[in-house]
């Protein structure tokens, strides 16, 4: 066996994350589940998937498999040709549990213990204003829910799961394997009950024995004022159904704030760029400034320079932690006109002369320049 076969069984790459491996396992396990897939060879493929996941879901076993292949994942003690073969631990009480702990067997694990369901993620887009003021949104998504027919037991109504005849309820089987390193003992998921410790004789017709069914689900999310992109809201119990009566997982709502055409924001501070003319900058003016709270008047002092920033107190976003309101910063940009009419040009020349500025006289416009200006004015 090469060092990628387990990855191939799950349909993932060798650098797949644990989340990717878990998702692939659930997909392939459901695809080849003997209660669902009646095709020839499906049961063997199901066992192969179980074996692959047993190794790749354990970081230590996975590392050994990547380096040494299946033999490395099944054992780790170097030892003579005999290894531990033929030694059943008789008279040593806890030896089996100790041995299992080395190989990830989990001897004390109760397969029938309630387990919480998987968490889910949902991305929500917010407008700039919704992020500033807060909003309540309803989100819709599909999730694995407790089967409404069998109420999660996986068994046909009127019947009940029974203790697995092969593993006797432990959910695992102990296997001795001859490897290049010697005889190694390992624990694998029971291929009859698939780790549950229970055997379903008559599967539920709705969920086919899984205890779960895919359902559309809606939930209302209250998004507080002042949130930013990347922040998450956790909704407890809105994830996927648990196992053996365990609770539902959680839903994590990930926020994405869409950009504004007018404003930028960092935390509780909102930024706005204001274009003014050089006469407004020189003489001063009072202008209307848009804010998320409505338009406000702002005075521009005479002699204002490009890059000057003014602060509008309390016109920013709410502070998510600690309370209070942020400010809006207004940065001035003086716009130089690209086209002047004769009156404007003469006025500026007069201003330059009055200021004592020494300027080279601009080139007088010829006939074709005047025609060009006339065409641009049309």
UniProtKB/Swiss-Prot annotation:
Zn(2+) 2 binds at residues 164, 167, 190, 193. GO terms for molecular function: ATP binding; heat shock protein binding; unfolded protein binding; zinc ion binding. CXXCXGXG motif repeats lie at residues 147-154, 164-171, 190-197, 204-211. Its cofactor is Zn(2+). Binds 2 Zn(2+) ions per monomer. It comes from the Bacteria. It is found in: Cytoplasm. InterPro entries: DnaJ, DnaJ_C, DnaJ_domain, DnaJ_domain_CS, HSP40/DnaJ_pept-bd, HSP_DnaJ_Cys-rich_dom, HSP_DnaJ_Cys-rich_dom_sf, J_dom_sf. CDD domains: DnaJ, DnaJ_C, DnaJ_zf. Its main location: cytoplasm. A zinc finger (CR-type) spans 134-216. SUPFAM superfamilies: Chaperone J-domain (SSF46565), DnaJ/Hsp40 cysteine-rich domain (SSF57938), HSP40/DnaJ peptide-binding domain (SSF49493). Gene3D superfamilies: DnaJ domain (1.10.287.110), Heat shock protein DnaJ, cysteine-rich domain (2.10.230.10), Urease metallochaperone UreE, N-terminal domain (2.60.260.20). GO terms for biological process: chaperone cofactor-dependent protein refolding; DNA replication; protein refolding; response to heat. The keyword Zinc-finger applies. Zn(2+) 1 binds at residues 147, 150, 204, 207. Participates actively in the response to hyperosmotic and heat shock by preventing the aggregation of stress-denatured proteins and by disaggregating proteins, also in an autonomous, DnaK-independent fashion. Unfolded proteins bind initially to DnaJ; upon interaction with the DnaJ-bound protein, DnaK hydrolyzes its bound ATP, resulting in the formation of a stable complex. GrpE releases ADP from DnaK; ATP binding to DnaK triggers the release of the substrate protein, thus completing the reaction cycle. Homodimer. The J domain is necessary and sufficient to stimulate DnaK ATPase activity. Zinc center 1 plays an important role in the autonomous, DnaK-independent chaperone activity of DnaJ. Zinc center 2 is essential for interaction with DnaK and for DnaJ activity. HAMAP family: DnaJ. This is Chaperone protein DnaJ. It comes from Streptococcus pyogenes serotype M1. The gene is dnaJ.
């Amino acid at each position: 066996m090469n060092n990628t076969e387990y990855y191939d069984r799950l349909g993932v790459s060798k650098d797949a994350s644990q989340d990717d491996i878990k998702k692939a396992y659930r997909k392939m396990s459901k695809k080849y589940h003997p209660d669902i897939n009646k095709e020839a060879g499906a049961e063997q493929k199901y066992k192969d998937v179980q074996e692959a996941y047993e190794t790749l879901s354990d970081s230590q076993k996975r590392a050994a498999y990547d380096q040494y292949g299946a033999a490395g994942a099944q054992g780790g003690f170097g030892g003579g040709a005999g290894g531990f073969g033929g030694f059943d631990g008789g008279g040593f009480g806890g030896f089996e549990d100790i041995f299992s702990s080395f190989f990830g067997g989990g001897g004390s694990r109760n397969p029938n213990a309630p387990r919480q369901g998987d968490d889910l993620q949902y991305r929500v887009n917010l407008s700039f204003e919704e992020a500033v003021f807060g909003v309540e949104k309803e989100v819709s998504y599909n999730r694995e829910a407790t089967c409404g027919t069998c109420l999660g037991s996986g068994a046909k109504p009127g019947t009940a799961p029974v203790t697995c005849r092969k593993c006797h309820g432990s959910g695992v089987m102990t296997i001795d394997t001859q490897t290049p390193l010697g005889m190694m003992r390992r624990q694998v998921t029971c291929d009859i009950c698939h780790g549950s410790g229970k055997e379903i004789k008559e599967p539920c017709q709705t969920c086919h024995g899984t205890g779960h069914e895919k359902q559309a689900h809606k939930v209302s999310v209250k998004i507080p004022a002042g949130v930013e992109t990347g922040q998450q809201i956790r909704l407890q119990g809105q994830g996927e159904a648990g196992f053996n009566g365990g609770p539902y997982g959680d839903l994590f709502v990930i926020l994405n704030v869409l950009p504004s055409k007018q404003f930028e924001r960092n935390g509780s501070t909102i930024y706005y760029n204001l274009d003014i003319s050089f006469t407004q900058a020189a003489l001063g003016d009072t202008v209307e400034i848009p804010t998320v709270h409505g338009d406000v008047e702002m005075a521009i002092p005479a002699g204002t320079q490009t890059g000057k920033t003014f602060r509008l107190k309390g016109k920013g976003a709410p502070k998510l932690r600690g309370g209070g309101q942020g400010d809006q910063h207004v940065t001035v940009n003086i716009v130089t006109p690209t086209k002047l009419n004769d009156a404007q040009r003469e006025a500026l020349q007069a201003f330059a002369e009055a200021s004592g500025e020494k300027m080279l006289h601009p080139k007088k416009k010829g006939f074709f320049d005047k025609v060009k200006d006339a065409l641009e004015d049309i």
